[in-house]
């Protein structure tokens, strides 16, 4: 298993990330494609987790913000690979990357159904719940 990253939106790594996100968010959850692929794509660092057989299994992206913060977005694991600890591996890789780049805080907007997952990784909820793409979400953050 290996996590790789890219900022190159023409790379195969990025295309694997988009394929995973399309399957999870557009096909499974009904998020409009126009909302899934956004203006921030070229500004993000895209991470993809590959199996030992080089099959893409999951993805997440980080959007650099100001004041030592990064926003974790588009966390997705393909359905056949869920509940195996792969999400934790991806998040930890993204956090390590952010910390090594001098960032000290990760922010995210979690689907409410994933709140417990992020809490187990040290994230805390803040602010009021909100709706995004027709689904309830909660703001969360973690100091690195």
Language-model-detected regions and their locations in the chain:
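Short amphipathic alpha-helix that is part of the acyltransferase structural core
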Residues: 1-34, 41-46, 50-55
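Short, solvent-exposed loop/turn elements at beta->coil junctions and helix N-caps
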Residues: 34-39, 128-130
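Short acidic/glycine-enriched loop/turn segments that link adjacent beta-strands
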Residues: 41-43, 68, 132-136
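Conserved beta-strand in the GNAT
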Residues: 48, 55-63, 71-76
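Glycine-rich ATP-lid loops
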Residues: 79, 83, 103
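Conserved acetyl-CoA-binding loop-helix of GNAT-fold acetyltransferases
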Residues: 83-96
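Conserved GNAT acetyl-CoA-binding A-motif
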Residues: 91, 98-111
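Conserved active-site alpha-helix within GNAT-family acetyltransferase domains
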Residues: 100, 112-128, 133-136
């Amino acid at each position: 298993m290996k996590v790789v990253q890219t900022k190159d939106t023409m790379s195969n790594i990025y295309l694997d990330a988009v394929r995973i996100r399309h399957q999870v968010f557009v096909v499974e959850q009904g998020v409009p494609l126009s909302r899934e692929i956004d203006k921030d794509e070229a500004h993000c660092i895209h991470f993809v987790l590959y199996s030992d057989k080089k099959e893409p299994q999951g993805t997440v992206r980080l959007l650099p913000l100001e004041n030592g913060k990064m926003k974790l977005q588009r966390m997705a694991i393909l359905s056949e690979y869920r509940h195996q600890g792969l999400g934790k591996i991806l998040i930890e890789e993204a956090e390590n990357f952010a910390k090594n780049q001098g960032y000290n805080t990760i922010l995210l907007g979690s689907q409410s159904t994933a709140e417990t997952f992020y809490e187990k990784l040290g994230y805390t909820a803040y602010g009021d719940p909100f709706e995004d793409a027709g689904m309830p979400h909660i703001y969360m953050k973690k100091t690195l």
